[in-house]
C-alpha cells in the first residue's frame, strides 16, 4: 500500500489533503504539531527517527500572523526561519522518498506576490520554494515528482 505523510494533516488544508488521499486507499499519517513541530529542530529530528521513508510527503505548515516590519523581533525571525525553512530542509535531507514518489509543497501566494504585512512568510516561503525548485531536478532523476 502507498504511504503518505502529511505535515499539518490534522486540520485545515492538511486535513483535507489527508482525507482526500484516504479516499484513494493511501495509508496516511496525518501529522499534527504534537508529532512534528517544524519550528523546533529537535522535534523534527525525533520525528525523522520514527519516519524514515514514505511514498508521498506533503510539506505543509501554518505561518505567522500579519505584523508590520518594524515590530518583528529577532525571536520571530528565528522561530519562523525554522518553521518555514530549516525544518523542511532538515526533513528533505533525512527522509527517503521511495522511487516513483511525490513531494508536495503547500505554500502561499506570497512566494509570487510578497505582502508587506506578511514579510516573514514572504521571505521564508519564497526561499524554501527556490530550494525546492532546485531539488526537484535531483528528485526527477530518481523518478520522484515535486509539486
Model-derived features with residue positions:
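Catalytic loop of short-chain dehydrogenase/reductase
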Residues: 104-128, 132-141
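Rossmann-fold scaffold of SDR-type NAD(P)-dependent oxidoreductases
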Residues: 7, 54-62, 84, 105, ...
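Catalytic Tyr-X3-Lys loop
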Residues: 63, 70-89, 104, 121, ...
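Helix N-cap/beta-alpha junction loops of NAD(P)-dependent oxidoreductase domains
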Residues: 64-68, 100, 112-115
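Hydrophobic positions on the long internal alpha-helix
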Residues: 58, 87-95, 131-132
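Rossmann-fold cofactor-recognition segment
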Residues: 31-42
Amino acid at each position: 500500500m502507498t504511504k503518505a505523510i502529511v505535515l499539518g494533516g490534522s486540520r485545515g488544508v492538511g486535513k483535507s489533503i489527508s482525507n482526500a488521499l484516504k479516499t484513494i486507499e493511501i495509508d496516511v499519517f496525518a501529522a499534527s504539531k504534537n508529532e512534528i513541530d517544524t519550528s523546533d529542530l529537535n522535534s523534527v529530528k525525533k520525528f525523522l527517527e520514527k519516519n524514515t521513508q514514505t511514498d508521498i510527503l506533503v510539506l505543509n505548515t501554518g505561518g505567522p500572523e500579519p505584523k508590520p516590519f518594524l515590530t518583528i523581533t529577532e525571536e520571530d525571525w528565528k522561530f519562523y526561519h525554522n518553521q518555514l525553512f530549516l525544518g523542511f530542509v532538515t526533513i528533505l535531507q533525512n527522509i527517503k522518498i521511495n522511487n516513483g514518489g511525490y513531494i508536495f509543497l503547500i505554500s502561499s501566494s506570497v512566494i509570487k506576490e510578497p505582502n508587506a504585512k506578511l514579510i516573514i512568510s514572504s521571505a521564508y516561503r519564497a526561499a524554501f520554494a527556490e530550494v525546492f525548485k532546485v531539488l526537484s531536478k535531483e528528485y526527477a532523476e530518481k523518478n520522484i515528482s515535486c509539486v
